[in-house]
Amino acid sequence: MNQETTRREALLLMASGVGALAVVSAAGAHAAAPAAPASHGMMMSDCVTECEKANRACLETLRYCLETGGPHVAPSHVRLLLDCAEICQVTANFMLRGSAAHAIACGTCAEICERCAKSCEAFSGDSKLAACADTCRTCAKSCREMAKM
């Protein structure tokens, strides 16, 4: 074996070990957590769904805004759409893996969704942006409830 082959094998082993450790760690953390009431699981599942809907709505609205141009591509508006899409996906991921920090993520997500909704509502008469605002408000409401858990 040459030195490069040994190095490559070591890197592969470390990468697979880190992935396996993360899975074992996540499984261990989940197993150690106290059982949540069934209603908590349903609420969390609903919140994940709302986060995924808001993520998609923001990304689709961003595409629409980029195609429309003009005031629709104001940097502050584009940043909020991106921020909202990303925090919604991250928050859904926190809940899906049973993170103990999901309430923190949900609180932040609710705040960003509200800001995004206000930014979208500023474009009065635009049905695409109004729909995005509605979706973000629904997500914000669901996340506020989960943040209390």
Give the ranges of each region predicted by the language model.
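N-terminal secretory signal peptides and thylakoid transit peptides that target proteins
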Residues: M1-V18
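Membrane-interfacial loop-to-transmembrane-helix junctions in polytopic alpha-helical membrane proteins
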Residues: R7, G41-M44, P71
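Amphipathic/hydrophobic helical signal segments and adjacent flexible N-terminal regions
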Residues: A15, A20-A27
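C-terminal segment of N-terminal export signals and the immediately downstream linker at the start
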Residues: S25-L59
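Extended, low-complexity, charged alpha-helical tracts
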Residues: E50, L62-T138
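Residue-level hotspots at or immediately adjacent to binding/recognition sites across diverse folds
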Residues: K148
